[in-house]
Amino acid sequence: MESVKNAKRSYEKEYRQKVCSPVEAAAVVKSGDCLCFPISVGEPTLFVRALAARRHELEGVVINQQHHLCPDYFTEDSAPHIKVNAWFTSHVSREAVQKGWADFVPNYFHEVPRLLRDYWPVDVAGTVVSPMDEHGYFTCSLSVAYTMEAIKKAKKVVVQVNPQAPRTHGNCHIHISEVDHIIECDEPLASLTIPPITPVEEAIGGYISELVEDGSCLQLGWGGIPNSVCKALLHKKDLGIHTELLSDGMVDLMLSGAVNNSRKQTHTGKTVATFALGTSRLYEFMNENPRIEMHPVDYVNYPHNIGKNDNVVSINATLEVDLLGQCCSESFGHLQYSGTGGQADFVRGSNISNGGKGFITTASTAKNGTISRIVPTLAPGASVTTGKNDVDYVVTEFGVAKLRGQTARQRAINLINIAHPDFRGELTEAARRMNRI
């Protein structure tokens, strides 16, 4: 008993010795260093702001990150001092990537930990963590993804301890002995406002819910369509969740009993995710919740792990679909808008799954109905996020197009049938010119 108490006192002493200010932590970074920060809500904002404040003292610092929050170093004058490799562009990094002040790194999300191991040095890693427990462990809280791998490889580790960060279960723990510097803060976590569901999103959610069977295992993203799907699935039974992103709509499914994870072949009884983003309600629900497990992205998003569960249903959004079924979900022509993320991982995982179904969703039009999202060919320079051989279903507010197992001719017909009526004529003419129909 005494040795346990001594260990606890030792952890507390070590913790106190490592506490520092954000400015002191930022002083650890040297010119030429490579840094790695977690996706979105896991970004240690106080550390990042302090680092950005001294950027003109540094040269050739590189930051690798998936999705960014702090805008301070995404400027033309910052690039020689701190250059960002964006693995997924956000509203913060998009302009910098397009103007060459930052770089974009194409990737499959499940491969990021391996890329860290094999290609990218990590001199300093920083992350938000939940408070330390009596055994000396923090958790990565809402952003596990590649965080554990970055910490494992880093020469120096900075954690930002926030009591508002939920303590999560799964493979997401960091011991005090792995940490070099501790920043304490108590600030609200980055959150999202849930927009009202539009009629278009409600229609798409309704079509998908009709094809989701009891006992299915779900992956959904964030936004109006996933929220609409979650609402439409509240009457289902024995659903499971194995997802990249955990969102508010999934909380409703769990609280209603529609999700109990009882029919999953892996992690039976548990909801599995690699990061979470939503409202404070989601974060409160996740805190110390034994029904939710957070695991690294190379496990969660690995297609063959996804496919170990039967009846996987993946639901992902796209920006543009051509008449063969190629989906561009990340760029407008050559202008990078976001990234592949986990879309390709889960589309492939659902294809591997026994009884699995993959849904690619989009409104039929953009820009107030002036542009069709279903097009004869993708725009010049567009990235193919999900290839034609992987796409199963495409869904708009006008219906569902089955593509998997269909001829090129039938694919074109099915896609034209779910395009906006205003564009079906010109799509049909284009398809004939290309000998698609």
UniProtKB/Swiss-Prot annotation:
Keywords in alphabetical order: Transferase
Keyword Ion transport: no
Catalytic residues as annotated in Swiss-Prot or TrEMBL: E244
Function: Acyl-CoA transferase involved in the anaerobic degradation of cyclohexane carboxylic acid (CHC). Catalyzes the activation of CHC to cyclohexane-1-carbonyl-CoA (CHCoA). Benzoic acid and cyclohex-1-ene-1-carboxylic acid can also be used as substrates, but with lower specific activity. Shows highest activity with succinyl-CoA and butanoyl-coA as a CoA donor, and lower activity with crotonyl-CoA, acetyl-CoA, glutaryl-CoA, CH1eneCoA, propionyl-CoA and acetoacetyl-CoA. In vitro, the enzyme can use butanoyl-coA as a CoA donor with greater efficiency than succinyl-CoA.
Catalytic reaction annotation: cyclohexane-1-carboxylate + succinyl-CoA = cyclohexane-1-carbonyl-CoA + succinate; cyclohexane-1-carboxylate + butanoyl-CoA = cyclohexane-1-carbonyl-CoA + butanoate
Example GO BP: acetate metabolic process
Binding site for CoA: G221, W222, G223, G224, I225, L319, G342, K367
Family matches, as PANTHER family: ACETYL-COA HYDROLASE, ACETYL-COA HYDROLASE-RELATED
Catalytic activity, EC: 2.3.1.315
Quaternary structure annotation from Swiss-Prot or TrEMBL: Homodimer.
One GO MF term: acetate CoA-transferase activity
Disulfides per UniProt: none
This protein's name: Succinyl-CoA:cyclohexane-1-carboxylate CoA transferase
Coiled-coil regions listed in the entry: none
Source species of the chain: Geobacter metallireducens (strain ATCC 53774 / DSM 7210 / GS-15)
